[in-house]
A protein has these predicted regions:
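Histidine-acidic metal/acid-base catalytic patches
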Residues: 1-6, 13-30, 54, 60, ...
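N-terminal pre-domain/capping segments
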Residues: 1-104, 109, 146, 266-279
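Active-site-proximal loop/turn and secondary-structure-junction residues that shape catalytic pockets
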Residues: 11-13, 36-38, 72-74, 120-124, ...
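Active-site acidic/histidine proton-transfer and metal-coordination neighborhood
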Residues: 18-19, 61, 75-179, 279
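A short acidic, helix-capping loop that chelates divalent metal ions and anchors anionic groups
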Residues: 39-43, 78, 85-87, 124-128, ...
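Residue-level preference for long, well-ordered alpha-helices that form the structural scaffold
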Residues: 44, 48-51, 90-97, 127-130, ...
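Conserved H-loop
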Residues: 65, 151, 244
């Protein structure tokens, strides 16, 4: 089967959003992973519903599907990266993150996006209390999204409270309707699952998928061919399980070379997929 590829806009921050979308479409991508941020579709700028309606028309005109990503570094706090989170100690801070995620759900509903992806946050020393906060927050967001027919997917992130797929499974058992946002590169940084095994084991629960190369045991997103990932095995697994959702390249530190990397990375993935035999 043919996989559907997208590219995360966090790797296109030197491009205006309209130019970035045109680059993706012209390069042959099927969609975009839209990270709501100061550079692209700022959710706190005026007239978000009107801008979302215009963006949907643009996406439809280019033939691009979408997922909404929520990992902006300084959108909520210009002085603390990725703060606040669902496990922040201050209740008002947690409420700010929940409100932001609900706004992202609204954007996803307006765009007709396939999913909204988000992560847990780095826990305090009291992991039991942090876990309780996480379950409460995710439950609230998933319930809000369900009323709007939007899929929520939590992404295991190395070093966060949901660090790997096993942590996600525990969370999903507590929050019905939650899906998995699987960044396959993270699997070789933490956890016991090989990336291709994770794809196969969690195929029915996949809400969003990201791919990139990555050095083993180091959380560095790299272009295909620049790390230790067995990308053919991951692509074969996605194909074997019949994954029909977007497979999003996340190269957030490569905006300076996006003009050449966007088409080159897609060509590399397609070549690897064509050479990946089914298992």
């Amino acid at each position: 089967m043919s996989l559907r590829y997208a590219y995360n806009t966090n790797g296109l921050t030197s491009h205006r959003l309209d130019d970035a979308l045109a680059l993706l479409a012209d390069s042959g991508y099927d969609g975009v992973a839209l990270t709501l941020d100061v550079a692209h579709h700022d959710p706190f700028a005026p007239d978000l519903p009107g801008r979302s309606a215009a963006l949907r028309r643009r996406l439809d005109g280019l033939g691009l599907a979408s997922v909404v990503e929520t990992g902006a570094r300084f959108l909520l706090d210009p002085r603390r990266k990725h703060h606040p989170t669902l496990v922040s100690a201050d209740a008002d801070d947690r409420a700010r993150r929940i409100a932001f995620l609900k706004t992202c759900v609204d954007v996803a509903a307006d765009l007709g996006s396939e999913a909204v992806s988000f992560w847990a946050g780095v826990p305090s020393d009291d992991r039991t209390t942090s876990w309780s906060w996480l379950v409460d927050g995710v439950t609230e967001v998933v319930g809000y999204a369900a009323d709007r027919s939007v899929t929520c997917a939590v992404e295991p992130e190395p070093g966060m409270l949901v660090d790997d797929c096993d942590d996600w499974a525990r969370l999903a058992a507590a929050v019905p309707g939650l899906t998995l946002a699987l960044d396959t590169g993270h699997c070789i940084v933490s956890g016991r699952w090989a990336p291709d095994d994770a794809v196969r084991a969690f195929a029915p629960q996949l809400g969003a998928v990201a791919i990139e190369d990555m050095p083993r045991a180091r959380h560095e997103h790299r272009a295909p061919g620049e790390g230790d990932m067995d990308l053919p095995a991951v692509l074969a697994a996605l194909r074997d399980v019949g994954h029909g959702g977007l497979v999003s390249l996340e190269l957030s530190r490569d905006a300076h070379r996006a003009d050449t990397l966007v088409p080159a990375a897609l060509a590399a993935l397609r070549a690897l997929n064509e050479g990946a035999p089914p298992r």
